């Protein structure tokens, strides 16, 4: 069997990883061994936080809806229940956006939902 020299491939792989570590402080951007560890941790954190971001935004929307709902004399859970009973299909993202940007429209939605429950 012929001898395989891997110098070119190793250099290419190291260069690619050091490119990913660009902007890191100190040895993390210059030394392969340290940079490799930093990049692996960064990729793991990014993967985890892409999933966490979805949860965080949902929590934020719920907090905003709850705060706006309490201004209209109801709570988040009662509002969501009345929206479902009134067959008003609006997601939490849109509801939170209305609560922040257009309080009058949010108030009308709350009134419609409460009217459907009492009727």
Swiss-Prot record:
Gene3D superfamilies: 6.10.160.10, Ribosomal protein L20
TM region positions: none
InterPro entries named among the record's database cross-references: Ribosomal_bL20 (IPR005813), RIBOSOMAL_L20_CS (IPR049946), Ribosomal_protein_bL20_C (IPR035566)
CDD domains xref list: Ribosomal_L20
Listed GO CC annotations: ribonucleoprotein complex; ribosome
Keyword field contains Magnesium: no
GO molecular function list: rRNA binding; structural constituent of ribosome
Keyword annotations: Ribonucleoprotein, Ribosomal protein, RNA-binding, rRNA-binding
Listed Pfam families: Ribosomal_L20
Domain of life of the organism encoding this protein: Bacteria
One annotated GO biological process: ribosomal large subunit assembly
Ranges in coiled-coil conformation: none
RNA-binding listed as a keyword: yes
NCBIfam families noted in UniProt: rplT_bact
Similarity field: Belongs to the bacterial ribosomal protein bL20 family.
HAMAP family per record: Ribosomal_bL20
Primary role: Binds directly to 23S ribosomal RNA and is necessary for the in vitro assembly process of the 50S ribosomal subunit. It is not involved in the protein synthesizing functions of that subunit.
Annotated protein name in UniProt: Large ribosomal subunit protein bL20
Organism annotation: Chloroflexus aurantiacus (strain ATCC 29364 / DSM 637 / Y-400-fl)
Annotated gene: rplT
